[in-house]
Amino acid sequence: MDTGTFEVHNNVPGQDPVLLPVVGEGVDTDAQRDVFKQRNKPLVDILFVVDDSGSMSGDQQKLASNFKTFITWASNLNVDFHIGVISTDVTTCSGHPCRSGRPPGCLHGSIKYITPSTPNLNAVFQTNAIVGTSGSAVEKGLEAAYKALSPPMTTDPKCNLGFYRPDASLSMVFISDENDQSPNPIHFYVNFFRSLKGSRNADLIRASGIGPSKITNGTCSGSCRYFEVSKQMKGIYQEIRSTNWKQTMTNIASASFGYRSQFFLSRKAAAASLSVKVNGVVVIEDPRNGWQYDPVTNSISFSKGQLPPPGATIQVAYKAVCLP
C-alpha cells in the first residue's frame, strides 16, 4: 500500500494550498473479483416537501388521505424508514407551520419523523402533512430541502437531528401547484443532493414531484423546475391537477422503496470479460431481464425483475483494464 499527497495551489489571497491524501496499491494480475452484499432490509429516508401557500388545502388533504397506499409498500418490503415533512416556505413567518419560530427546513409536527415503530403512524403523517395555507406565496421547495438536509437543521435536536442517515437511501417528494422559485439554478440543488451519497452511490437518492408542469409525450411546458429535478434524479413526476393520487403515491413508493440495484466495481473492467453471480447462480447480461454494465460509471446495474434479494451475495468477476 502506497500513500502520498496532492498539493493544490490557488490564486486566492490568503488561501493556503489544499492537501489531498492519496492511497494506492499495485497489483500484478488483471484478474479481479468484487464481492458485494445486499442489505437484509432497505433503509430509506423520505422527505416530503409540501407547498403551504393559500391554494394548497385540498392537495394537502389528498396527500394525507392517500398516505396509506404509500406506506403499504414500505410494510410489504420490510423497509426501515424515516418519513418527515417540511414546507416550501423558507421565509420568516409567524403563522402555521412556522408558529413558534419554526426555522426554514425544520421538520413539521410534534413527532418530527415517523419510523416503523411509531404508534398510529398513519394518523401522525396525516397531521404532519397538513402544513397549513398561510405560508409564503413564493414557494421555494428545492431551497427548503437543501436547508433541511444541511447544518444547522441536521444537527438541531428541535428540528431534524436523527432524520437523515448517511447509510440510507434518500427520496424527496416535492408537492406544489406552483413552480419552484428557489434562488439557485437547478444544477446547484441536484449536485448538492447527489453529493450527500457520493458519485458511487447514485442509486441511493431519488427526487419525485407532484407539480404544476404540463407534460406532453415526456416534454415539459410551463413551470418545469420540479419536473427537471425529478427527471435528472430518476424519480416520478405527475401533474398535480390531473393526478390520480392513489396511483401516483403507488408510483412514487415503487421508486422510493426497494433494494440496491447498482454496484460499482473496484477497477476499470474489460466489458467483454464480465461475469456476474448472485448467491452462486450466474445472471445473464440483459438490460431487460438481467444486468448491464455502464462503462462511464464502471458499475453493474440489475433490471427490476432481477434485483438481488435481501442478504444476497453478488460476485462480479472480470479482467481489469490497465490504465496508463
Predicted segments, located by residue:
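Divalent cation-coordinating acidic motifs and surrounding scaffolds
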Residues: G24-V296, Y318-P324
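Surface-exposed, short loops/turns at beta-strand junctions within beta-sandwich domains
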Residues: F302-P310
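Extracellular adhesion/glycan-binding regions together with long Ser/Thr-
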Residues: P295-S303
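Short glycine/proline/serine/threonine-rich loop/turn segments at secondary-structure transition edges
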Residues: M1-T5, F163, G311
